[in-house]
Design a protein with these regions (language model features):
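Conserved N-terminal structural module of periplasmic/extracytoplasmic solute-binding proteins
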Residues: 2-102, 109, 297-298, 319-320, ...
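Alpha-to-beta junction loops
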Residues: 85-96, 186-187, 263-271
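Glycine-centered hinge/linker elements that transmit conformational signals in sensory
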Residues: 174-181, 215, 219-252
Length: 427
């Protein structure tokens, strides 16, 4: 199937033209018999160094199939992939954000992986990407959302400290927010991180919707959002979510990157595991509680899935490409990933070897939360559109739009996209 047959979601014509030239001028690197690898880590020197160390070691052991790397800034990466697909210049190996994988597989960019069954089985579910019954991507790590709270504030209010075994209920969470909001030394009870953009809103707030009993789409066949995104349970979620801001418990315009929490303006912060160490450095490890998500009635959930590796459908040497991915997924490199960027390894055997996730490690609670509550975003090629539509709907709800009609329109828009793409059927 031609890789240009279907539209790459989110790629503009100008970006295609610009990025084709950029990629073509830098592409290549394997030479005769070699394989090419593209990554989004051009602006992340620590993660890029881990990948480069694996490439160097692999190339020493496999001189006939050396890997050549191209690193792009994350903001330009997806456009680069889309442009390369249009021009027929996809690399052999590419990394991708987990929820994007079904769209790229459906569009013909990716081939199913042929890694060993032993490795596949050893990887946690949230770091594996399946579509249409086949494994297309695996990731070296994942992270988790969590609630960060000041121990001193929680103790002052006297509210129960939730655990993975017994998360807060909605009533308990609402009570805790009310008590925290009454503390005069803080401006708001919680920073909900609404200043963040991109994929954050679906990643962070759809799990709350799902805990209420709604969802982004019917996950049985991904054929409709009606009755899920606009269900009574979804309306209840929207009503509660907006009340956080309308009732003055959270700011609609918080500082970016958790600065309100770090500067002592709020006692609680809805964030990811990547903010734990900075928070502990600011206040001390004992003062920062890492708390699980709230159970709003249908189980507690957090978003799952991070960056993963796949093999392009046009690879001239898929055997070597899969072999490199297996090499990169060894414990040695999973530990390096974890120590470099703070995420937990996707294979259990690597965890005790890490600095932060071993028993008693500063980030051990983050992995515990992720393992207990991670829910992958819908594995459908239409997810990119679903994500964008939900993002807009949630923002509109916070800004005061009618909740039921906003969710009705969002469900209609998602269903229209599904129909327009013939149900995103595999061919």
């Amino acid at each position: 199937m031609s890789t240009t047959r279907r539209t790459f979601l989110g790629l503009g014509a100008t970006a295609v033209a610009a990025t084709v030239t950029a990629c073509s001028s830098r592409a290549g690197g394997g030479g005769s018999g070699g394989i090419t690898l593209w990554t989004h880590n051009g602006g992340n020197k620590d993660e890029l160094a881990v990948v480069q160390s694996a490439i160097d070691a692999f190339n020493r052991r496999n001189p006939d199939t050396p890997v050549g790397i191209e690193a792009f800034p994350q903001a330009a990466y997806n456009d680069a992939i889309g442009a390369a697909a249009v021009s027929g210049d996809l690399p052999d190996i590419l990394d991708l954000d987990g929820p994007v994988m079904p769209n790229w597989a459906w569009a013909g960019y990716l081939a199913p992986l042929t890694i060993s069954s032993e490795l596949e089985t050893s990887i946690i579910d949230s770091a594996k990407g399946y579509w249409n019954g086949a494994l297309y991507s695996v990731g070296p790590y994942d992270t988790s959302l969590c609630l960060l709270a000041r121990r001193s504030a929680i103790e002052e209010t006297g509210v129960r400290v939730p655990t993975v075994a017994r998360p807060w209920t909605r009533d308990e969470f609402d009570h805790a927010l009310g008590e925290l909001g009454a503390l005069t030394q803080y401006e708001y009870a919680i920073d909900m991180s609404v200043a963040d953009g991109a994929e954050w809103w679906p990643y962070a707030y759809a799990p709350m919707l799902q805990s209420f009993g709604g969802d982004l789409i019917d996950r049985t066949d991904f054929s409709t959002a009606k009755g899920f995104l606009n269900a009574p349970e979804a309306v209840a979620w929207g009503t509660w979510f907006r009340s956080l801001f309308a009732d003055g418990l959270a700011s609609q315009t918080p500082a970016t990157d958790g600065q309100d929490f770090l500067q002592g303006k709020v006692p609680m912060y809805y964030a990811g595991g990547w903010k734990v160490l900075q928070s502990q450095e600011t206040f001390g490890q004992e003062e920062v509680l890492v708390l699980p998500p709230v159970d709003f009635g249908r189980g507690a959930h957090v978003g799952g899935g991070s960056w993963q590796w796949g093999v392009s459908a046009t690879s001239r040497n898929p055997e070597a490409a899969n072999r490199f991915i297996e090499f990169l997924m060894q414990d040695e490199y999973l530990v390096r990933y974890s120590d470099a960027i703070g995420n937990f390894p996707s294979v259990e055997s690597a965890t005790p070897l890490t600095e932060n996730y071993k028993d008693g490690g500063a980030l051990a609670p983050v992995r515990e939360i992720g393992e207990a509550f991670a829910l992958l975003r819908p594995a459908t090629p239409g997810y990119r559109v679903i994500s964008s539509i939900f993002d807009k709907a949630a923002r509109d709800i916070v800004s005061g739009a009618d909740i039921k009609s906003t969710l009705d329109q969002a469900a209609d828009n998602i269903d229209f996209d599904i129909r327009s793409n013939d149900g995103y059927r595999a061919v």
